[in-house]
Amino acid sequence: MLKEHLDPRKPSGTGYTSKVRVRDKYHIVGFISSGTYGRVYKALGKNGQKGEFAIKKFKPDKEGEIIQYTGLSQSAIREMALCSELDHANVVQLEEIILEDKAIFMVFEYTEHDLLQIIHHHTQPHRHAIPAPMVRSILFQLLNGLLYLHTSWVLHRDLKPANILVTSSGAIRIGDLGLARLFYKPLNSLFSGDKVVVTIWYRAPELLMGSRHYTPAVDLWAVGCIFAELLSLRPIFKGEEAKMDSKKTVPFQRNQMMKIIEIMGLPTKDIWPGIVSMPEYSQLQSLAMSRAPGHFPRSSNLEGWYQSCLKNGGYATSSGAGTPGADGYDLLSRLLEYDPTKRITAQEALEHPYFKNGGPISANCFEGFEGKYPHRRVTQDDNDIRSGSLPGTKRSGLPDDSLMGRASKRLKE
């Protein structure tokens, strides 16, 4: 429930007075990014409130040139509700929500980096691998936060590098809970109301196959994709998304499924018994028959991809602190398991030899790293948080919800 600040000098029950406004508490430094939800600004605390903050302003629904105050989107409500309740060092947490002039502002601690930004940095001006200890720390913290979400009965449903935030002290925060959803005893299948979840490159095969009763395993597949991308500096399954038609029918993502099959092999009922009952199984069969015999590998080529990745990245192919090694491949293969019932869980992943055998894991993923990552771009253009225009497009290279970070409001576990 959203609460405006009441004047303590006025008895309760007599109405709202002396509301705290965003600019009363925060100095707006500049504009960061925008998206379909609205805009994000960087701010500093005022009146003794120390720290840097990211303020996310939701835009009202608009019809033509007339603004219609018809309420908040389902995504915004979910994000506010969940962020207000969750409490974990590796999950985004909310500082406060401010209601001002029919606009909603979510205030978060400012985070300086995200994984998309870090990966991009390692491709410029030439490709240079992310250090193996950093990858290990990032993955451990990510799985630690994900375990908390899953034990709290929350599916994230949109894990991708842009939504994995990193503080200047190297702490990982899982951000953007706009698609997150509770999954215990659902009244309806999780498919209802949300026909498309998870950005296409990180979408689990059961989602591509039309599953309506998916599980936390969808998040673990996305973690596998992120792990692979940290090592290779490019998305492992970079397909092209087929858009919905005019009837809002969700199409079979043929190209994305092809990208997965090219590395993981053609899924069969022997390795994934439940696939034969999937709504899109006939489409998969059609895809397989549309290619010449032998076009798609019958078995996984993930290990070959992994070894090539280590070689190209300059990682040692043996074991040791300077390489993900054989343990890294084993964990990756368990994360990228076709059958969601066999896919490794967050708890199991945290206990995997990849983390157990490589020595201590730093809570600061930057520990030992001598380089520096660039700061976020903050502009003075259109930085009026109250009257700023609200375009529906986002800044190039600055993903939606890329600034979510840790905050102080807590609910004890």
Swiss-Prot record:
Entry protein name: Serine/threonine-protein kinase SSN3
Compartments, record wording: Nucleus
Domain of life (superkingdom): Eukaryota
Catalytic activity reported: L-seryl-[protein] + ATP = O-phospho-L-seryl-[protein] + ADP + H(+); L-threonyl-[protein] + ATP = O-phospho-L-threonyl-[protein] + ADP + H(+); [DNA-directed RNA polymerase] + ATP = phospho-[DNA-directed RNA polymerase] + ADP + H(+)
Protein keywords: Activator, ATP-binding, Kinase, Magnesium, Metal-binding, Nucleotide-binding, Nucleus, Repressor, Serine/threonine-protein kinase, Transcription, Transcription regulation, Transferase
Main location: nucleus
Keyword Kinase set for record: yes
Species of provenance: Aspergillus oryzae (strain ATCC 42149 / RIB 40) (Yellow koji mold)
GO terms under biological process: negative regulation of filamentous growth; negative regulation of transcription by RNA polymerase II; nuclear-transcribed mRNA catabolic process, non-stop decay; positive regulation of transcription by RNA polymerase II; protein destabilization
GO molecular function: ATP binding; cyclin-dependent protein serine/threonine kinase activity; metal ion binding; protein serine kinase activity; RNA polymerase II CTD heptapeptide repeat kinase activity
Pfam families: Pkinase
Entry GO terms, CC: CKM complex; mediator complex
Signal sequence region: none
Entry-linked SUPFAM superfamilies: Protein kinase-like (PK-like) (SSF56112)
Cofactor annotation: Mg(2+)
EC number: 2.7.11.22, 2.7.11.23
